[in-house]
Amino acid sequence: MNKGWLELESDPGLFTLLVEDFGVKGVQVEEIYDLSKPIEGPVYGFIFLFKWSEERRSRRKVGPSMEESFVVDEDIVNDMFFAQQLIPNSCATHALLSVLLNCPQISLGSTLTRLKYFTRGMGPESKGWAIGNVPEIARAHNSHARPEPRHLPEKQTGISSVRTAEAFHFVSYVTTNDRLFELDGLKPYPIDHGPWGEKEDWTEKFRRVISERIGNATGGENGHDIRFNLMAVVADRRQQYETKLNTLKTNRQIVLEALQQVGGVNTKKSIQYAEVSHVCLHPPKFVPCSDDCAIWDALRYSSALRCSLIQHGCEHPSIPRSDGSTLVSWPSCVTSVNIVVSGHLKYVLLCFSIILDHKLEKLVPARLDPIKVNEPHLTSLIPSAFGRESHHKSKASSTVTSSSAAASSSAAGTDGVQPAEMKPDEFLHPDASRRVGFLEMPWRSDEARPLSIHTGYSKIPSPAPSNESTDTASEIGSAFNSPVRSANRSALQTIPEGSITKQEGDTKTDANIITVCLKRSLSGEGGGPPAKRLHIGDPDMALQRLGSGDSVEGDPMALQGGSGTGDAQQDQHALQAGGARPNMAHAFAPKDLLALLKNVETEIQICEQHLKDEIEKRKKYKVDDCRRTHNYDDFIRTFLRMLAEQGQLSKLVDQHVLVRRRQGVSVGRLHKQRKPDRRRKRARVSDKYRRKKQ
């Protein structure tokens, strides 16, 4: 068994199929062409191919310093899987097994699992013999090797004997106990390259080590003709893309369900979402009382904010109030007000989503705080307590006039901030909504992260927040696991949140309101990637109503189970101090949902194309492997027999020999007819005669 091992080529497809034959799942091998480019996904180890004879000479020139890094401690050596190569032509399998058996995250399968447990605690020599005594490994190795010719070819004069004596060798680089090791089956012990830095990945350490090694090897006398090959053992790309594709399809279904729910409510209430047809600051004839809507209280920040009121024409019924008076008529369609910080990165400061029925019961503002609250020009724009305090301020003014200058002046008197005057035309211009625009939110590039629907305003536990991730869906690579809870918070990097506030003095319950929010839960250092939850409050799906004495401030989705204090109170204090909460939600309009759906569809198409490419690549690996391992002797013998039976073989042989003779004659004639040489000879002879005459 130990005498029949064949040589293997350095090909990523061959090693990938060899891994599958070993019974290992979720692993593939990729070739590395550029050391400076990062590798997507987790890297389990590296396999390095070099010309062994030249490598040995170059290391001998450098000096015996490499021997100082040998690990001779038996406990350390026997604890890892390091086997000496005792079988010829088995270095490729040795290097691959050294990576697979030293990585606990890999699913090894029955064959390698049995080998790993059987050789536990053995020395390198015993492990080397154990590899040769596993018939499954030997069969898998030889099944991907090129068959040896039965008859040795005639000696070719064009190949030197020195070149034929050179051999190539495989070694592996793995990590064990936070240290980088080089495992060479021809060495007696592993080579320890030491730990890597605290703030770097182990692949950066390997990049420096392998670059230094290649530099030392190419610095020799014959180093220019040394050929290297580097391969990385990574996670299976097909499984990664399949997982990502399933997540994207789940997110698409969630968004579709959200749109169906929004559409169902809109059908019942005759609410229509359409393109912007008219933009005005104060709609004539339809101005509500200030104590019934906090939107107009926000207009006191008009000196620094741009407000676009998107209004759709519908009938305007009168709405009775609880105190017997009548509220000024409002349109029975959806009216949304977007108040945006002028020139601040495209982040929405305040966003109100107001859904009105033919009988208005409640107007619920949703607040979005700025992304960075430590900037002076933003902290002055945020009220200390938007919910209850803004209601008192709005109630203090009896009516809201139709002049934006009056609203801004009242804001300056309240907060002590003297705003610069703005022309009303700047707000009333029909293109104001286009200038403000439906700004691209930072979450729209993360469609590949999990979404989930929560119906109702009940206390729903959510993962603790942490730093914001700005990776797009296409840059995530292999990180698709669920978010991990973390207590780490970031005071500098926060994202906006939608909040639903019930104002005091309103004895009526909340109206049937559907609120679509995207909740982002962020992980801390060492945790998983951020995830998103799509929260939908639907009255038809057991939406919890708020009583007359209830007041929900902040994000109701962020309230943890229990008393509801703790993090919520800390976040509220931070909000009162001019800060923003780190764990927040985004308010969605149907247009936003449609844009999100479009982005998810685009990501699905990209992911499907990548998955298709990986599947085609795997098929190509199998085709190349069949071409490599197929024995063509029987086919060639049968073809020559058929030619001989038809009398064509002798003619082809004579024709081939004749062509070779003609080529030889023509080459000889060309060598004899060298005109430049004759001219030189004539010139030399004439010079000799001239000298003699002189």
UniProtKB/Swiss-Prot annotation:
Residue ranges of domain UCH catalytic in the record: 4-235
Extent of Low complexity compositional bias: 396-412
PROSITE patterns: UCH_DOMAIN, ULD
Short motif Nuclear localization signal, span: 678-683
Positions of region (Disordered): 392-427, 454-487, 665-694
Subunit text: Component of the PR-DUB complex.
Function of the protein: Deubiquitinating enzyme that plays a key role in chromatin by mediating deubiquitination of histone H2A. Catalytic component of the PR-DUB complex, a complex that specifically mediates deubiquitination of histone H2A monoubiquitinated at 'Lys-119' (H2AK119ub1).
Protein name: Ubiquitin carboxyl-terminal hydrolase BAP1
Native organism: Branchiostoma floridae (Florida lancelet)
Lineage: Eukaryota, Metazoa, Chordata, Cephalochordata, Leptocardii
